[in-house]
């Protein structure tokens, strides 16, 4: 976090925000750094929700691959974060479900990994300690796979061969040399829907959109809908394809 604030000072940034899915574990250290560096802190949070009627009729919202799934943000929350007792219980329940999914994906990853090299194995606790603060997410799993491959195979050719065997179906490794690109490739081949280590999320891992908005408002924040609009090929999701209907839907959700 020191580097983030150093860069902010160098670029004369007056306001700096922090954001993560479901959790606010970084708020305290972020707040202390903001005071130390005299930069105004903006506390934010992000949620993954589920709109069941949209899922049932196949309507994609702002996740282009999963009908009914909605990404939703809260901006400018109070510090300390206090969503209320019942909302905190619900948040903790969602986090537990999310981590159960991550553990199941690690189990599937380990099956793939040990089939290639029985001496290698991933651990949920190690991934959380090494790559995450509290909550393990898909990106942390991808990073763990990359780091595991790099530590075991110093030769790029052997490393690529190892990863290609994990991918299966005669797929090749194209993201080598760029950590972010390689981790995205690992996510696409192993962790996304259709991937060899994919585990579908339980509906209990999602909050209802009404609950999400209530948590944000109770925490002093502003409910915000992050608009996807289109992808690289210029295609819109069904939810966002008509601006008037999009405006109406967001207004009904008390957004804007």
Give residue spans per PLM region.
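Generic marker of "main functional regions" within proteins
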Residues: 23, 28-31, 49-51, 57, ...
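An N-terminally biased module of ancient metal coordination in phosphate/nucleic-acid-related enzymes
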Residues: 1-69, 77, 185-220, 225-256
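Short flexible/disordered coil segments
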Residues: 52, 105-106, 111-113, 179-189
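Long, low-complexity, polar/charged, intrinsically disordered or flexibly structured peripheral segments
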Residues: 154-198, 206
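Short, charge-rich amphipathic segments
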Residues: 28-35, 136-148, 168-183, 204-214
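Generic alpha-helix detector with strongest preference for long hydrophobic helices that associate
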Residues: 8-11, 15, 83-86, 90, ...
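Non-catalytic, alpha-helical, charged scaffold/linker segments
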Residues: 80-165
């Amino acid at each position: 976090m020191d580097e983030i604030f150093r860069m902010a000072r160098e670029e004369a940034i007056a306001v700096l925000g922090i954001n993560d899915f479901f959790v606010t574990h970084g708020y305290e250290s972020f707040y202390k750094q903001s005071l130390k560096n005299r930069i105004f802190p903006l506390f934010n949070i992000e949620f993954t929700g589920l709109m069941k009627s949209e899922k049932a009729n196949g309507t994609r919202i702002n996740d282009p691959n999963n009908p009914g799934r909605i990404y939703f943000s809260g901006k400018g929350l109070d510090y300390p974060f206090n969503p209320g007792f019942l909302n905190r219980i619900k948040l903790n329940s969602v986090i537990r479900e999310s981590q159960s999914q991550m553990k199941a994906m690690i189990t599937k990853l380990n099956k793939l990994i040990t089939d290639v090299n029985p001496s290698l194995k991933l651990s949920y606790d190690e991934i959380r300690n090494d790559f995450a603060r509290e909550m393990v997410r898909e990106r942390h799993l991808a990073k763990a796979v990359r780091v595991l491959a790099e530590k075991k195979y110093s030769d790029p050719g052997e490393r690529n061969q190892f990863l290609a065997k994990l991918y299966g179906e005669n797929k090749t490794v194209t993201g080598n040399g760029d950590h972010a690109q390689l981790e995205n490739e690992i996510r696409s081949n192993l962790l996304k829907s259709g991937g060899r280590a994919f585990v579908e999320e339980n509906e209990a891992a999602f909050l209802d959109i009404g609950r999400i908005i209530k948590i944000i408002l109770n925490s002093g924040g502003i409910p915000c809908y992050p608009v996807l609009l289109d992808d690289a090929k210029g295609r819109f999701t069904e939810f966002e394809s008509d601006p008037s209907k999009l405006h109406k839907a967001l207004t009904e959700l008390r957004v804007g």
